[in-house]
Amino acid sequence: MQFPSLSCGILIKRYKRFLADILLPNGEQITLHCPNTGAMTGCATTGDTVWFSTSDNPKRKYAHTWELTQTQAGDFICVNTQRANQLVQEALEKRWIAELAEYQTVLPEQKYGSENSRIDFLLKADNQPDCFAEVKSTTLLTENDLGMFPDAKTERGQKHLRELAAIAESGQQAVILFAILHTGIQRFAVAKQIDPQYAALFEQAKNVGVKVLAYKAQIELVLGKPISMNLQFSCEI
């Protein structure tokens, strides 16, 4: 998956969950939309480098969207939770996920379950039961390179586990895929200390046959096309 063209600045603060102020290289301060409802622990430290996209939609109140954090330790984190589903959808359609490569049809955002839910992806294949796949963006880095989910209590996440467990018990396939979007994470575990109820439901779901996958994204910046130059002005972040 390729990001749109990104610009960068230095994070001043995140506030009201969905907003963040950053300082651009030219000294201008702007406000970004933050597309992440989580605690963003370790992803929003003052002084980190923020990479953002810019929309040309005139109806948007905030034209800029926070996409990546580059921490002062050098790690990259994708904080736009929508990117997790886009990344996984591409991987499913190209059959890059070995455990799910048998499914030919990928249907995003399908209604299902008894709690008025939407599954991230409904997967279909000839002569196979349907597979219901839920994606969780994972960015919380703890000690010893351990990544954890959730980073805050999540009633919505608890509901998803109940729905997936019911699917598995009905004889269909159910999968929860943790998309690791922090380059510093090397291992994964459920954050029982943050949301004990989620951890309990996770164990129940596993025990009734919900499959658990964790895939780490490769996040990198690469050299792009040449641009015009103004040699009379330069700045550094």
From Swiss-Prot:
InterPro entries registered for this protein in UniProt: SfsA (IPR005224), SfsA_C (IPR040452), SfsA_N (IPR041465)
Pfam families: SfsA, SfsA_N
Molecular function per GO: DNA binding
Family classification: Belongs to the SfsA family.
HAMAP family, per the entry: SfsA
Protein name per Swiss-Prot or TrEMBL: Sugar fermentation stimulation protein homolog
Organism of origin: Actinobacillus pleuropneumoniae serotype 5b (strain L20)
Gene this chain is encoded by: sfsA
